[in-house]
Amino acid sequence: MTHYEGDLRPPTARFAIIASRWNARITDVLVAGARQSLAGNGIGEDAIDVIRVPGAWEIPVAANRVAQSGQHGAIIALGCVIRGDTRHYEHVADLCAEGLMSVQLQTGVPVLNGVLAVERVEDAEARAGGSHGNKGEECALAALELVNLMELLP
């Protein structure tokens, strides 16, 4: 039986971080965490592209373009959707997640979903460097591992 597992060795691949500007107080921290995590694992700044889009709704289309270019080993999607008084939150969060999954399944490029879908701003703060860590950092580590794993898989 063959066992495949990725690790955190720095690959030669480029990484794309696609982040929304909406809720920038949160997303800026997520982006910084992702960049620090990649750099801390041997990925140079010249191998990281940061792409800003207006909001979470626009992340999947940008991810699709980036994935189709074939220039990146993985895409890290970062955003923050906070529940409001209408159902808009549910549409944006759910369809963003579906779009990101569709991109990675159609292109074979790993897309890490770091788009926070939270009830309150305090929940987002907890996941952007607070008591629940930094989801940008976590997505970057998963991206590193997946890039290495994809190189191993037949």
UniProtKB/Swiss-Prot annotation:
Transmembrane segments: none annotated. (2S)-2-hydroxy-3-oxobutyl phosphate binds at D85, T86, R127. Its EC number is 2.5.1.78. The active site is at H88. 5-amino-6-(D-ribitylamino)uracil binds at W22, A56, W57, E58, C80, V81, I82, N113. Pathway: Cofactor biosynthesis; riboflavin biosynthesis; riboflavin from 2-hydroxy-3-oxobutyl phosphate and 5-amino-6-(D-ribitylamino)uracil: step 1/2. The keyword Transferase applies. Keywords: Riboflavin biosynthesis, Transferase. GO terms for biological process: riboflavin biosynthetic process. GO terms for molecular function: 6,7-dimethyl-8-ribityllumazine synthase activity. One of its GO terms (cellular component) is riboflavin synthase complex. The keyword Disulfide bond does not apply. It catalyses: (2S)-2-hydroxy-3-oxobutyl phosphate + 5-amino-6-(D-ribitylamino)uracil = 6,7-dimethyl-8-(1-D-ribityl)lumazine + phosphate + 2 H2O + H(+). Belongs to the DMRL synthase family. Forms an icosahedral capsid composed of 60 subunits, arranged as a dodecamer of pentamers. Catalyzes the formation of 6,7-dimethyl-8-ribityllumazine by condensation of 5-amino-6-(D-ribitylamino)uracil with 3,4-dihydroxy-2-butanone 4-phosphate. This is the penultimate step in the biosynthesis of riboflavin. This is 6,7-dimethyl-8-ribityllumazine synthase. The gene is ribH.
